[in-house]
């Protein structure tokens, strides 16, 4: 699911006709699919292994983040009440919360403007507990996390920041490919 017809056509045209037995990596198909869906896939944040982060200092409580860097999609709105969710692997170190602020290892706001080259991470304010289903060989891996609030209908293909493309399902997300 999620592979677009134009990606399949491009894949088969690139592969061509041959009598030789060849192995083709799925990454080739996924590359064609990315070209087909990238420009129309809104961004969303899904925080795996989510941990809460209290922000200390002057930080905007209401704001917006672009839904897609190259299109006129409406921005994603957020409200920060108690803090934000970040991935556990990102906690405990100075980082830049994407399009929000620079923080130290303890969540103290150091700058609203980007001040240095620290890692930029995604985050969710509020959000809803959700599951991301990933096909891994013959297994289905279920990753629990916090999904950014959104209004996308079931079946919408979205780009999960730092993860890959997924389809919005009634009860969570289904990974298409990274």
Where do the language-model regions lie?
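Catalytic adenosine-cofactor/nucleotide-binding cores of aminoacyl-tRNA synthetases and other
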Residues: 1-178
């Amino acid at each position: 699911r999620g592979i677009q017809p134009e990606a399949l056509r491009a894949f088969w045209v690139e592969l061509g006709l041959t009598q030789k037995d060849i192995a083709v990596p799925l990454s080739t198909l996924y590359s064609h699919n990315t070209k087909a869906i990238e420009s129309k896939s809104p961004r969303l944040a899904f925080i795996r292994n989510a941990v809460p982060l209290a922000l200390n200092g002057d930080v905007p409580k209401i704001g917006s983040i672009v839904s897609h860097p190259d299109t006129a999609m409406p921005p994603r709105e957020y409200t920060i009440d108690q803090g934000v969710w970040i991935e556990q692997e990102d906690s405990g170190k100075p980082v830049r919360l994407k399009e929000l602020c620079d923080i130290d290892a303890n969540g103290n706001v150091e700058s609203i403007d980007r001040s240095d080259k620290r890692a930029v991470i995604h985050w969710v304010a509020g959000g809803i507990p959700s599951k991301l289903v990933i096909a891994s060989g013959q297994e289905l891996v279920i990753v629990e996390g916090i999904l950014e609030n959104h209004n996308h209908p079931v079946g919408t293909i979205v780009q999960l920041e730092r993860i890959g493309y997924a389809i919005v399902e009634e009860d969570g997300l289904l990974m298409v490919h990274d």
